[in-house]
Amino acid sequence: MKASASGGSAKSAHQGSVNIRRVAAADVAQIIALDAEMTGVEKADYWYSRFHEFGTRDLRNRFFFVAEADRHIVGYIIGEVRDWEFGQPPCGWVFAIGVRSDCRLTGVASRLLEALCDGLRAAGVTKVRTLLAFDDLLVMSFYRSQGMMAARMITLERNLDTEGAT
């Protein structure tokens, strides 16, 4: 989960209703802007690619939801069912979740995650997983509050910037 520094009026998310729905092509520009506020990098090609991959194909196993308040995107989540990777039976994965910082603590991220979990259950899986940086306490706290805990798998990595570096 990432947070933005700004992004419009929080009034709409706090006082109006927030609707969780599948992403539409018209939402992508707002998602790009929201992500750029959170990360400091505009990644238009990346987000259009994510829309085409998760918002238009195999919608039974791929999910891209947005949280909308008064026609403004205040959050998003992307996930899918992955089959037999790393020798594991099919399970759901959360790839991205983001909520405007002024909409935190209003239940938006929880509602997005629950919408994804509902889709994953309907697709027949019984577990959901994600990856996050071990020192990202905000994200860790959110996922722990949602009942997620350390899994029995670990991530290994190798730095490819220099030959032989780890």
How does the language model describe each region?
Residues 100-102, 106, 135:
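Active-site acidic-Proline motif in GNAT/NAT acetyltransferases
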Residues 130-139, 157, 161:
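Conserved beta-strand-loop-alpha-helix junction that forms the acyl-donor binding cleft
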